[in-house]
Amino acid sequence: MVSQTILIFIGRGGINKTTFFYYILPPCLRQYFINESTANYTDKDFMEAFSSKALICLDELESTFGKGLSALKSNVTKLVFSIRRPYDKYRSELLHRGALCGTSNSIQIITDEENRRYSPWFVDNIESPRETPIDYQHVYAQAVALGQEVTNRVKNQEEGWVYWLTTVDIDVMREHNGMFMVSN
């Protein structure tokens, strides 16, 4: 299972958007955070981060067009990255493990009307996690409980329940994302 949605915080600078994403990982896992403010979405290092990092922050995310947009959309949904590392004779198959998040000061960042991968939200302010520490024990206990619920529902094949976005969900998301579309 791969997270195919990018949670994006949009708001003015200095309100702890990136800081929040960094601190959402407890200190023992922060080595698995990467801030990619100048990411080249076709670069092998960027693709390798999907396997080696837990959270990839697309900081200062702006409008993405053309080849860059196609590469980003493809990378978000890939289950496996097949890359040849420098000096290796053969390709390595790297499982997609990382989730993406993003920040932007710009409101209009979406260029693709069909883009269901972006989940942008206006943020006025975020309490500094440096000054008000995150209660990791309770946050991650809730995450584990939700993960177990998803696993059980999938295993039990509960009728009418899915863990992916439905057509209705995608329509609602498109309507919401309309306010973040780049004007033509």
What are these regions (language model features)?
Residues M1-S52:
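P-loop NTPase catalytic core of nucleic-acid-dependent motor ATPases
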Residues F46-S51, R85-T103:
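AAA+/SF3 P-loop NTPase mechanochemical coupling elements
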Residues S52-A54, H96-A99, E113-S119:
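Short glycine-/polar-rich loops that comprise or flank the Walker A/P-loop
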Residues A54-V76, Q108-N115:
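Conserved AAA+/SF3 P-loop NTPase catalytic/coupling segment centered on the Walker-B
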Residues L69-E93:
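Conserved catalytic/switch belt of AAA+ P-loop NTPases
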Residues I110-S128:
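A short helix-turn-beta junction within AAA+ P-loop NTPase domains corresponding to the substrate/partner-engaging
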Residues D124-R153:
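C-terminal, non-catalytic macromolecule-binding modules
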Residues T151-N184:
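DNA transaction DNA-binding modules
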